[in-house]
Amino acid sequence: AANYTLISDRIAPSGAVSGAAVKADGYGLGVKPVVRALWAAGCRDFFVAHPGEGIAVREELKDARVHVLNGPISNAINDYVYHDLIPVLNSLDDIALWQHACRDRNRKFKADIHIDTGMCRLGLDLTETQTLLSDAPALLDNIDVQLVMSHLASADDVNSPQSAQQLSMFKSAFDKLGIGKQSLCNSSGVFLGPD
């Protein structure tokens, strides 16, 4: 909780808020005591890798926003809906799957959009991002987009130009989409500057 408080205090003047990654059983510390401590410190957004981890967080915190980084899984859609988990959509296929889930249930469900700006791990690649930007209203019609996110690949290297390049790409995509809130920085990125 001390790290969360340090980062939250650092970004508070900008109006930004922080979330916490609690993957892998709270990084081996036990997800339930970790999320309780973070909740007490003011954290409301929790990031996990898989829906099972999200369910564990939801069982402990009924009012938290629980984001599942690895995207929706077709055979677990009911788990996302029932437990109010927010999938991170990492590809056009993820967007189509979540769009279908929303239409089937005649409801708008929350989701985050992840754009790969250089991490090369998760997120829409450049081609998919261009497709999304050119047809966002149709592709995201039934989706309640909460966050548009990316992840800094070299934030721990203050001399790397990659973070500035990623920030520029991310801002451009976010501005064109015009929906949701921005989420870019990992812990190290917060200390690179106010942008």
Q: What label would you give each PLM region?
A:
Residues 1-86, 99-100, 144:
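A charged N-terminal "starter" segment
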Residues 19-22, 47-49, 67-69, 88-90, ...:
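A cross-family glycoside hydrolase active-site/sugar-binding cleft signature
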Residues 51, 71-74, 92-95, 126, ...:
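Structural motif corresponding to alpha-helix initiation and N-cap regions
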Residues 24-37, 41, 83, 95-110, ...:
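Active-site loop/helix belt of alpha/beta enzymes
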Residues 1, 89, 161-164:
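Conserved phosphate-coordination/catalytic loops
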